[in-house]
Amino acid sequence: MRNHSNIFQPFVGERPTEYADRVGRWYASTVTEPHKKKYGQYLTPIPVADFMASLVDPKGPAVRILDPGAGTGVLACALCEKLSSHPVKPRAIALVTYETDRALIPATTAGLDYLKTWLVAREITFTYAIETKDFVQANARALDDSQGTFSQIASLEEPFDVAISNPPYFKIPKDDP
């Protein structure tokens, strides 16, 4: 990805969700339609991300979130913003994301770094990890677990409190590993 520091500079008062959306729209304008199709890329509209976040109500001092198809982090940002405004907001949020498009990682990192700064200003500790692999392929064995326990998820150091995701935007063949 080319360095466009003016694109990656947050505006004063900009919500992390708005920033991630803006960076995502810029990135989408730099890649071809076949590229977007290959990676199943779809920009989640901010109102949809906000609605999805509004459905989550985890309680506790720490929240662990999974975003298995992060993109630039619009869904994760919307969820973290929502949690930060909860009457009993968490003191710590840990986010594990998966993103297969390595060219998108600088934009993902920019969005999550801005989210971290935004949350720290609200006295919430924020950590994140970006896994550059396919969540389904990396966790196929656990996802096929007949017990439904997901006990073998690769990033499962401890259970997740919430997962936020769009469906995949490409068809997965039946014989896919």
Task: Locate each region found by the language model.
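SAM-dependent methyltransferase catalytic region
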Residues: 1-177
